[in-house]
């Protein structure tokens, strides 16, 4: 059937090492017994991290059921609906979020579950001051200070996330601010600096702060979104003429440090890296560049597959 076909495809990806959520938990918090002999369905489910609608547990029967029966690897919380920003999604206030995340974890039935969020600081913050949460500076603001100050800021953020029941933060951004007017990065203050070494230092410090609070960090958007003239939320983003090897420098540096980190691929097309597919769908970029040349052997996670750079161009 369709689900089994999807499971078999995921097993192939599992063996390729593109996204090993179970392996991550085995290394950092699961224990060998929990993953002694996962079924095909369990492996498939653990490869998926999904969004859902609802704020209170009683509104979330569908996702709670999928966590139980499909063994989902994770969920992600949003403030607003991605397709209609006027509609609320998962976050109202701290007490409500704690009830929701407790129910999500309770449904995992012994399987590890990531509860994720995008909390970079600045304009990219799902937990916002208007809902009673602390305000945090953007990467651009942090980049004007010291890496130690960045680590302390991320530690405070991580402690807040942990208290809310979140254990995975899709931050920090390792994109170099090559093009300050880049609509998805530079214009929003999401890059630490135009200097790759400064990006590496602040990115590593941010990840250290999150890790010290018990939060897994995610470096993004590989291989580099900072030179892009377009926004991958809205369509194909071709960096063939603007990207350079210097944008890999933060990854080379930050990935060499110990810690609980993942790498997120961007929906970025570069004809010289892969003439057919964007990074998210590219064995050449993931297995060849990231795992081969850079030697990364950890978890790789995609950017949102509902973004138009993927959803408008590819079918399942």
Task: Give the label of every model feature segment.
Residues 46-52, 73-77, 115-117, 169-171, ...:
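Hydrophobic faces of well-ordered beta-strands that scaffold small-molecule active sites
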Residues 1-13:
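N-terminal secretory signal peptides that target proteins for export/translocation
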Residues 16-29:
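Bacterial N-terminal signal peptides
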Residues 34-131:
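N-terminal hydrophobic targeting/anchoring segments and the immediately downstream early-domain regions
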Residues 58-62, 87-109, 198-316:
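Second-shell residues forming the walls of enzyme active-site clefts
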Residues 105-134, 154-177, 199-223:
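Glycine-rich, aromatic-flanked loop segments that form ligand/cofactor-binding clefts
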Residues 93-97, 144-156, 200:
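Glycine-rich anion/phosphate-binding loops
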Residues 132-145, 189-193:
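A charged helix-plus-loop insertion that forms the helical arch/lid used to bind
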């Amino acid at each position: 059937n369709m689900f089994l076909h999807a499971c078999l495809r995921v097993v192939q990806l599992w063996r390729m090492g593109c996204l090993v959520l179970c392996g991550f938990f085995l290394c950092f918090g699961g224990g060998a017994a929990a993953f002694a002999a996962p079924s095909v369905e369990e492996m498939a489910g653990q490869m998926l991290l999904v969004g859902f609608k609802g704020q209170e547990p009683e509104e979330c029967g569908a996702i709670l059921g999928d966590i139980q029966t499909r063994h989902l690897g994770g969920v992600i919380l949003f403030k607003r609906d991605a397709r209609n920003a006027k509609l609320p999604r998962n976050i109202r206030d701290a007490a409500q979020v704690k009830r929701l995340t407790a129910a999500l974890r309770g449904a995992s039935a012994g399987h590890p579950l990531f509860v994720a969020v995008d909390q970079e600081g600045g304009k990219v913050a799902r937990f916002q001051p208007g809902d009673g949460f602390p305000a945090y500076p953007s990467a651009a603001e942090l980049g004007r200070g010291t890496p130690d100050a960045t680590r302390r800021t991320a530690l405070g953020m991580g402690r807040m996330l942990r208290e809310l029941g979140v254990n995975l933060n899709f931050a920090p951004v390792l994109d170099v601010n090559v093009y300050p007017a880049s609509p998805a990065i530079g214009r929003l203050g999401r890059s630490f600096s135009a200097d790759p070494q400064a990006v590496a230092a602040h990115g590593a410090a941010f990840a250290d702060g999150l890790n010290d609070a018990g939060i897994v960090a995610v470096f993004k958007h590989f291989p580099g979104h900072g030179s892009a003239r377009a926004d991958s939320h809205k369509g194909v983003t071709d960096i063939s003429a603007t990207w350079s090897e210097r944008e890999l420098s933060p990854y080379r540096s930050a990935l060499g440090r110990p810690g609980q980190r993942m790498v997120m691929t961007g929906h970025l097309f570069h004809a010289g890296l892969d003439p057919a597919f964007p990074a998210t769908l590219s064995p050449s970029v993931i297995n060849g560049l990231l795992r081969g040349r850079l030697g990364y052997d950890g978890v790789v996670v995609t950017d949102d597959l509902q973004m138009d750079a993927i959803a408008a161009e590819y079918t399942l």
